[in-house]
Amino acid sequence: MASSRAAKSLPLQVAAICYRRRGSAIEFLLVNTNGGNKWTFPKGSTDPRLSHSQAAEREAAEEAGAIGTIEPRQFHLYLHAKGVFWQPGGVQEFVVKAFLMEIHQMRRPDESNRKPTWVTPDEAKRRLSKGREVKYLRELEAVIDRALERIQFHNELWGSYPTTRTSRSSASV
């Protein structure tokens, strides 16, 4: 997890860790990066007019067409890097606040090049690992593990995710 010192000195992004239930199985929603050669969670910049969870929810809708219930508080903080590692100065690090979001509906994403794809937790880890340095890969694996723990917690406590706020759309998951 990102240290508090790093969190204070790096730019901030927000991510929606989108999931759905398929019977007793959990699937995560990944999108292609802008370059198209890596997979990631829907994420992006904060907006002073929105809470961080609302900004993450916006990213899920724009990049993946995902509509659902997002937790108002982050469940994890992780480091992410953009750029190319083999060029000096080619990488920008970010601290990312991760928000868990259960998806109820899908629509056409605003960013059509993102190719939203549902995958198992193991497949998510495999896809997230491609083309990444080990330290960032471990950060993303930890996001999946923490998300699964949180989902299990919700299942044990409430029997499912507590529905508090759901956006609207025309297509179901």
Language-model segments: what does each one mean?
Residues 61, 65-107:
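Active-site segment of metal-dependent pyrophosphate-handling enzymes
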Residues 22-24, 35-38, 47-48, 79-82, ...:
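Short, charged/polar surface micro-motifs in flexible loops or helix N-caps
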Residues 9-14, 34, 91-96:
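Short connector loops at helix/strand junctions that flank enzyme active sites
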Residues 2-28:
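Conserved N-terminal beta-strand and adjoining loop/helix that marks the start
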Residues 129-173:
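Charged phosphate-binding loop/patch that engages nucleotide di/tri-phosphates or the phosphate backbone
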Residues 98-141:
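NUDIX/MutT-family hydrolases
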Residues 40, 93, 118:
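Short aromatic/basic micro-patch
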Residues 25-69:
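Conserved Nudix-box catalytic region and its N-terminal flanking loop in Nudix hydrolases
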